[in-house]
Amino acid sequence: INRLSLMLEQNNVLIGENAWGKSSLLDALTLLLSPESELYHFERDDFWFPPGDINGREHHLHIILTFRESLPGRHRVRRYRPLEACWTPCTDGYHRIFYRLEGESAEDGSVMTLRSFLDKDGHPIDVEDINDQARHLVRLMPVLRLRDARFMRRIRNGTVPNVPNVEVTARQLDFLARELSSHPQNLSDGQIRQGLSAMVQLLEHYFSEQGAGQARYRLMRRRASNEQRSWRYLDIINRMIDRPGGRSYRVILLGLFATLLQAKGTLRLDKDARPLLLIEDPETRLHPIMLSVAWHLLNLLPLQRIATTNSGELLSLTPVEHVCRLVRESSRVAAWRLGPSGLSTEDSRRISFHIRFNRPSSLFARCWLLVEGETETWVINELARQCGHHFDAEGIKVIEFAQSGLKPLVKFARRMGIEWHVLVDGDEAGKKYAATVRSLLNNDREAEREHLTALPALDMEHFMYRQGFSDVFHRVAQIPENVPMNLRKVISKAIHRSSKPDLAIEVAMEAGRRGVDSVPTLLKKMFSRVLWLARGRAD
């Protein structure tokens, strides 16, 4: 990572292509905020170098971590008192801690690590013992990174806590089981215990690498006779904990979580610690149904979370406001997210339905080609394939917009850093859509060329008829070509005898038989433009 500025909310799901720097970001957070006793010192390998030019490695690195109180005035509570000197009042009424780490690398390979706390203007605050304050900050807000075997091997120090708290975990589970059975929701004691057993198995799945090799305690691993049933019970328990008034259960769950963690490895968390949870690709080795239950459970933990994923399934379980796209640009990694202002309630509902629930994987795309309906989706995908363009491999998604409206999709794409291009018909509705695009582009003619293609015909059927495919329409309509009949009637009869999508596929297949030269020039130009947009967004 050369440069990155990342605003974090309570829940964050980070997505991006393989080269955006995921491992570097997670490594930096894990090393700088590790709950180990020693503060981290930078090494030569931590400094950025231009890809392929290791001799061009930088000599300076600079990281600022900003911590904000959850509510104005919270910085005064007991657990934050030792950090009194580090808090800075800001114009929005919140207090923040700006913790800066700098690395300086000398010619002889030695590296110096400097720490400071800053005021809101970026000037260092005069603090008595900076390292002591930094240790306290990390003790209160450590990072816990779930399941990345490679990384855990790198920082593992092999010490095992003397007394594993296995019996405490059993006690907490017992207490949670008793609490839950007083609100049974039609679950018997046995079923609750089976569900909790699945919960522990699940947490173990995520902590399997957190800690030393010898400390692999298997807690409550009596294999349920029917594992599927256990998962179902866990799902019901999740929902019980998640309803209003379930806060006490969440606190118990958090205690269970901390105990499990300590029983598994080398970590001792401060009693006041509120860890930041890093969850790397939680979909690994989990069936989609299990993933849904697992994700619900992780969301119940009252902790700030950063998850990374390549799973459309997981994105469909995540409000779009929590998703952050990271895109590598020439001089930095750009972070795109809706942000606190988000979308209007109606736009948010439309995007949730159209994208999150029905096309979650389109959030991974580099460019959206927005078309009016199903006909265009079939024709465009097929004709692009005939021209040798593989939209999937190029990160291009064809999305129909008639159902959700054009404006919310374009607004959302822009806020998320996704390139876009719109194809409209030449009828009245199409002209309105084109006007919408122009208004979004402030009537900039140059930008219009990049983002808008309008068919010089009423719709895709009329356009393809005039582009030399009239024989297909006559054949499907079962009307000989020499019979005098206007094209609107021929098209209408053809649609009546098959359907709009089937007719579209028929036309595209015919184009495939005739070869690339039969694909209309207007569409070829559009394909080139969309590919150009997508490649500009590629790493």
Mark where each language-model region is.
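RecA-like P-loop NTPase motor core
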Residues: 315-316, 321-429
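Charge-patterned, long linear interaction tracts outside catalytic cores
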Residues: 225-231, 380, 385, 474-539
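Electropositive, glycine-dotted interaction segments
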Residues: 72, 76-178
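Conserved P-loop NTP-binding catalytic core
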Residues: 26-91
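Flexible phosphate/Mg2+-sensing switch loops adjacent to catalytic phosphate-binding sites
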Residues: 34-59, 125-131, 262-272, 331-333
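Extended helical coiled-coil dimerization/tether regions that scaffold
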Residues: 152, 158-275
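Activity-critical C-terminal alpha-helical subdomain
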Residues: 432-506
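Switch/communication elements of ASCE P-loop NTPase nucleotide-binding domains
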Residues: 1-34, 232-358, 435, 532
